Structure formats: structure tokens, C-alpha cells
């Protein structure tokens, strides 16, 4: 009987922690993600492709590449776009870095594969940068699609 009571007590003490979560943070995420309905995403996609970037370059559109790769990554794969902002993801949301971001032109958020750029884009949009777009596939996809022609679009 004592063993059963001990087990029951242990379960009662552990159950609340299993179901516990940060309710305030969940409310913030709900406010952010509830805006991303299929209709909104269809009308205003959050991604920009290599093809889109090349078209923008061709048309001489004014946009900014926000390179959020780490310093080690930017040394490993050196080319960056002319006029790009290089702000590592772990420093992006510091007030002085957010102040560098334009509000009046597209921001293509770039990382190596596009995964971190997706997270950063969602967060940037959540704080008011609705002009931020994930550079789909990142620099890896750009290099794959453009190949040797990449030197036409980048500088060392």
C-alpha cells in the first residue's frame, strides 16, 4: 500500500511539470504565427529565390542582402554581395543592428542553406520588418543554380 501511495504521489508531482510551458511566450508566438494564414502566405510569400534575386539585379532594383552567417562561414565562403549587410544571426536583434536595416526596400536574409534565414525572417517580420524575405536555399543554392556565373553578381 505504501508503495502504491508513493507512486501515486510521484505521478501527481510530475504531471504538472510535464504539461507546464511558458504561457506568455506561447501567447507571443500565437500572435506571430496566427497572422501566417495560407491566404496571407499566398499573397505575400516570405521567401525569395535565386531566380528572383537575379531578376532584381538585372532590373537594378534597390534591395539589401542581409548575410547572417557566422564570421567563420563568411571567411570560408568569402564572396558577399555589393552593399550587403553582414550581421551574424546571434547579433541581429541588438538595437544597433536593427537600426541598420532598411524599412523602404526588400531585405533578402541569407545564410548557408536558408534554415537560419527562415527563422530570422519570421522574427524580423514579427518585430515589424515586413520587407524581410528568406533567401531560399541560401548561398549554397545560389552557387548551385548560378555556378561559375556567380562572379558576375558578387565581389570578393
Can you annotate each of these PLM segments?
Residues 2-6, 16-59, 72-106, 115-156:
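Rhodanese-like catalytic fold shared by cysteine-dependent sulfurtransferases
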